[in-house]
Amino acid sequence: MNAEKSPENHNVDHEEIAKFEAVASRWWDLEGEFKPLHRINPLRLGYIAERAGGLFGKKVLDVGCGGGILAESMAREGATVTGLDMGFEPLQVAKLHALESGIQVDYVQETVEEHAAKHAGQYDVVTCMEMLEHVPDPQSVVRACAQLVKPGGDVFFSTLNRNGKSWLMAVVGAEYILRMVPKGTHDVKKFIKPAELLGWVDQTSLKERHITGLHYNPITNTFKLGPGVDVNYMLHTQNK
């Protein structure tokens, strides 16, 4: 099954889906195209768990879960995890890897808007990592995430800022020079300024709690969280 056979929805970019379908079989290859995701996952997981006050016993939704790197790690923390994605092949990889790892994650091929229509207010934590820049209407995703979380629950977003530096680092550097990710992975026009994301958040029931940058040092080949949101950044919000 390919991206064109996925359920129809206005907020799906089939070209974006096809990119990830093509490399889905290598999602769990620690030295493959998704090596950066494996490298930053401990940072993402640590940030989410700390800001949410732990994940054990919580009901968590991972929006745009892909092959399940973050979803599995949150399940290992004791969360009950549902992973959403519109890519059939990435979900098949995620399901197989979870089975092989003995990890329980419920993977669903569905848009977040469709899921919100049926499961509003059911999750303690919602995560949406590196997904907003891959859909036609990211504001619609933000609205749906707000609808899905319980009162007092936590919603986390991560994406890329839109400016010259992020183009140099995430496109020229990561795709063409360092070849950390496949060429064509990113479109700088789809990157999202923090002010834009915060503006969408302000139009929902969510409230900003914390924002941090995710930084890569090519000399030491390491990632870290810290001040500065000029390239990659993560946002923690909470439902009012």
Curated annotation (Swiss-Prot):
One Pfam family hit: Methyltransf_23
Catalytic reactions of this protein: a 3-demethylubiquinol + S-adenosyl-L-methionine = a ubiquinol + S-adenosyl-L-homocysteine + H(+); a 3-(all-trans-polyprenyl)benzene-1,2-diol + S-adenosyl-L-methionine = a 2-methoxy-6-(all-trans-polyprenyl)phenol + S-adenosyl-L-homocysteine + H(+)
Gene3D superfamilies with a match to the protein in the record: Vaccinia Virus protein VP39
Source taxon at top rank: Bacteria
E.C. code: 2.1.1.222, 2.1.1.64
Pathway connected to this protein: Cofactor biosynthesis; ubiquinone biosynthesis
Record-linked InterPro entries: SAM-dependent_MTases_sf, UbiG_MeTrfase
Principal EC category: transferase
Keyword S-adenosyl-L-methionine applies: yes
Coiled coil: none
GO BP, one annotated term: methylation
Binding positions for S-adenosyl-L-methionine per the UniProt entry: R44, G64, D85, M129
Keyword Amino-acid biosynthesis belongs to the record: no
UniProtKB keywords: Methyltransferase, S-adenosyl-L-methionine, Transferase, Ubiquinone biosynthesis
Protein family (similarity comment): Belongs to the methyltransferase superfamily. UbiG/COQ3 family.
Matching PANTHER family: METHYLTRANSFERASE, UBIQUINONE BIOSYNTHESIS O-METHYLTRANSFERASE, MITOCHONDRIAL
NCBIfam families xref list: UbiG (TIGR01983)
The protein's role, per its UniProt record: O-methyltransferase that catalyzes the 2 O-methylation steps in the ubiquinone biosynthetic pathway.
UniProt-recorded name of the protein: Ubiquinone biosynthesis O-methyltransferase
Species classification: Bacteria, Pseudomonadati, Pseudomonadota, Gammaproteobacteria, Enterobacterales
